[in-house]
UniProtKB/Swiss-Prot annotation:
Organism listed in the record: Mus musculus
PROSITE patterns: ACTINS_ACT_LIKE (PS01132)
Name of this protein: Actin-related protein 3B
Location within or outside the cell: Cytoplasm, Cytoskeleton; Cell projection
Top-rank taxon: Eukaryota
Amino acid sequence: MAGSLPPCVVDCGTGYTKLGYAGNTEPQFIIPSCIAIRESAKVVDQAQRRVLRGVDDLDFFIGDEAIDKPTYATKWPIRHGIVEDWDLMERFMEQVVFKYLRAEPEDHYFLMTEPPLNTPENREYLAEIMFESFNVPGLYIAVQAVLALAASWTSRQVGERTLTGIVIDSGDGVTHVIPVAEGYVIGSCIKHIPIAGRDITYFIQQLLREREVGIPPEQSLETAKAIKEKYCYICPDIVREFAKYDVDPRKWIKQYTGINAINQKKFIIDVGYERFLGPEIFFHPEFANPDFMESISDVVDEVIQSCPIDVRRPLYKNVVLSGGSTMFRDFGRRLQRDLKRVVDARLKLSQELSGGRIKPKPVEVQVVTHHMQRYAVWFGGSMLASTPEFFQVCHTKKDYEEYGPSICRHNPVFGVMS
């Protein structure tokens, strides 16, 4: 039975969890990764909380329902991509499986995703939950970066299918730059950038607040988020962009209409410089975070330069974008231009230092954008879980009972040949 039904693919992120069945192009559900629980009057530690489990255990909500429950305590079990509270995560998964996917877990193989540099212990915890609590027949824990690379095969820019590339995964909570060679993550070279979707939202909120436009204070964050998603884009040159707005403001300034949640009256805001200043913090992080000065193109270049020399050219040739915060218009084009400038400057310098005797071979820089970018990790999982090889590489319940949770510490790479 388990082999005949499609595997379930669950991608748990800091902000949102994407879930659905393998073989589909988009996840069936995208829900906030939060859980609303009734907190008892007594503050107890985790060990006691396990003892006190009972009726309270069933009284919880996840996703959008959790956000709409003001009388409950809303918790986010995942921070910066890593699961921090496994008790809450188990309850979260319970509703994911039974309420959203409406699946009988004994009948479906599961593909779960994990962030880069996840600890082997965390894989074991996940295996325990899936095999012990849900009794799944098979589990595969895939690295998000590898799935994002697989998803990029749908792009017209990609000639041959390869699992060598550099993944820029930018979600709500964190942006990672992850080099992958032949399907294996080069862990020592990963870098993270403390700028992601949430920071852009906060920055836009701050810009709007400074202008003192008539936004109700309790709605300022959601208004900033809506403006970010609807109107923001990446500009090629920030000085020219300011000039463009000053010359013809009517053409470029947009209007956002919102409704005051308390008195139901409309409010209208002009959205001007915020449109390009928001996402610009990827390339000029000092605008929002004075402690971090490196642009995303410099970080990508540094990561590639720290990798083994024989994979550097293939990495420059396959820079793959993944996650909702890479969806801004012209993000890929600007990144490719800036990265090419850095690389060309280095080649020019080496030529000058050699007195013109050495002419370096030009480096091809290509940033791959594709229409599956927003849910790239989930879609890559959906693709790979649809292949016959998936069932061969899955860790089965039988293996788990024989060897224990340590089998899930290692998950073989597959899918290059398919």
